[in-house]
């Protein structure tokens, strides 16, 4: 078993919500009660969304900080790959370990391809820029977040696929892991199972630059060539580093591409939507 401890810890900040101004004196007799109730409802919805985003961020950070099971094709003989793959099938590796078998928690199972190079970029500087951006009063959009990522060279991103635990995730992971071993993708990882949960497991396939659309599309083609036909979503890592998950206060969609496999098209292919500008790119 090869164990990897991430060197970079992520920092997250839960931002305060801004309330609307109170109604003027002439409005209060008619509107004060309804606006107060509406404001309270909005505050509750915002708090729930903030809690959900914070919870997802905490879960992600916890998984990243726990030991990873890694097959590193740069160092490990390929002859050992099949045994490793069989030993660490994602549906049989427990996220929280097994005290009875003296098994420790596992954050992720990953394969590093032969040309894998750890991501660069200034994550700490990125997070400092993010703090300043939030305090500046500027409207926060995909383009402003992209600007931060470009300035700090934090450009990696990943295709995500969510699969039922058991045969489906094990079969899909086998194809994806082999693609990484052969160098068709740089790195891929899969979440371990949670035995007492119905939550699906997720496979992530990384690209070096989320702003390079051609690179993103090539990775989708590699995934489809392994036989994966489920819905795929693409998320820039900058969103993860900044703690931007679904239901965030800026109403940003944390995924910027969506890929659906068209079974009726001949030849069969992906239909990929750019979710930022709502255009079909394939």
Predicted segments with their positions:
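Charge-rich, low-complexity segments
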Residues: 17, 29-155, 246-282
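Extended amphipathic alpha-helical regions
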Residues: 128-281
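Intrinsically disordered and other compositionally biased segments
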Residues: 5-6, 34
């Amino acid at each position: 078993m090869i164990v990897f401890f991430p060197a970079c810890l992520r920092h997250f900040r839960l931002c305060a919500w801004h309330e609307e101004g109170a109604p003027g004196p002439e409005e209060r007799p008619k509107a004060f009660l309804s606006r107060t109730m509406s404001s309270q409802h909005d505050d509750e919805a915002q708090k729930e969304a903030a809690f959900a985003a914070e919870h997802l961020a905490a879960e992600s950070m916890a998984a990243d900080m726990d030991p990873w099971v890694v097959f590193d094709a740069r160092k490990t003989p390929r002859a050992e790959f099949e045994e490793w793959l069989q030993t660490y099938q994602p549906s049989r590796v427990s996220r929280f370990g097994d005290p009875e078998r003296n098994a420790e928690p596992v954050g992720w199972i990953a394969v590093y391809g032969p040309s894998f190079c750890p991501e660069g970029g200034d994550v700490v500087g990125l997070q400092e820029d993010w703090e300043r951006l939030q305090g500046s009063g500027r409207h926060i959009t995909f383009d402003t977040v992209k600007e931060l990522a470009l300035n700090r060279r934090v450009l990696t991103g990943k295709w995500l696929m969510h699969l039922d635990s058991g045969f489906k995730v094990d079969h899909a992971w086998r194809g994806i892991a082999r693609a990484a071993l052969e160098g068709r993708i740089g790195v891929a990882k899969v979440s371990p199972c949670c035995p007492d949960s119905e939550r699906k497991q997720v496979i992530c396939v990384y690209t070096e630059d989320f702003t390079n659309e051609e690179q993103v599309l090539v990775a989708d083609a590699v995934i489809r060539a392994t036989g994966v036909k489920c819905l795929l979503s693409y998320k820039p890592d900058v969103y993860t580093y900044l703690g931007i998950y679904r239901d965030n206060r800026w109403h940003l969609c944390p995924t910027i591409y969506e890929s659906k496999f068209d079974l009726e098209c001949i030849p069969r292919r992906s239909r990929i939507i750019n979710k930022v500008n709502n255009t079909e790119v394939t």
